[in-house]
Amino acid sequence: MALLSLQQISLRFGGPLLLDKVDLQLERAERVCLIGRNGEGKSTLLKLINGELIPDSGEIARQKGLCTAYLSQEIPRELDGTVYEIVQDGLENADRSQVKRDIHNDWEKRHQVEKVISLMELDADAEFKVLSCGLKRRVLLAKGLVCKPEILLLDEPTNHLDIASIDWLEEFLLRYEGTVFFVTHDRVFLKNIARRIIELDRGNLVDWECDYETFLTRKQAVLDAEEKQWSTFDKKLAKEEVWLRQGI
């Protein structure tokens, strides 16, 4: 059974449909990249999966007790406190239905927070506001991971990161046992992480069911076929125009 299933989902914000009766299934332990042009609605789809938005029509089926964590493109400017406080906040403010049964009492919560901070190689007592951009993103990732999510949603996770921070993130995600669904314009990161490519194009989702290199080959073949089809059509149209000018 899929962790999450989108069935005939449609959504618009006043203009054209961002999502037009799309279907999507996410399975356990997948690493999926969502690609598409700017403004296509990629971030919107991530927020739908995270439960922040409600579709105009269609159904989102979630496995019982499913927990998702969402890391947005931007770092909140107003966020303040120590690393420990911010990560703990991710547990305290989570929907109770999404908090795993093994982390309910105070000792279990404290242990889980400390465990995630250690896993992310962070200093629990460090002040968030003085950290580098890379470490701030790592803290926000820890805040999401503290609830043990089955699906990790990442929106441009390498934005403003230095090479060392990107390398660390790649290594972490390759070890991560949950499902990762992410958006990125970083082609090297995409190639290293994704094992499944989904393309959002004019409201429609195309599941290429392959890694990035295979996607490039298949996509080029599709574009070549379309170009050939249009070339044939143009030649036919040109012949018809000549025929019309001859008055036959």
Q: Where do the PLM segments sit?
A:
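Short cytosolic helices in intracellular loops of multi-pass membrane proteins
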Residues: 231-247
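Charged, low-complexity surface segments at secondary-structure and domain boundaries
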Residues: 99-101, 245-248
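ABC ATP-binding cassette signature C-motif
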Residues: 1-231
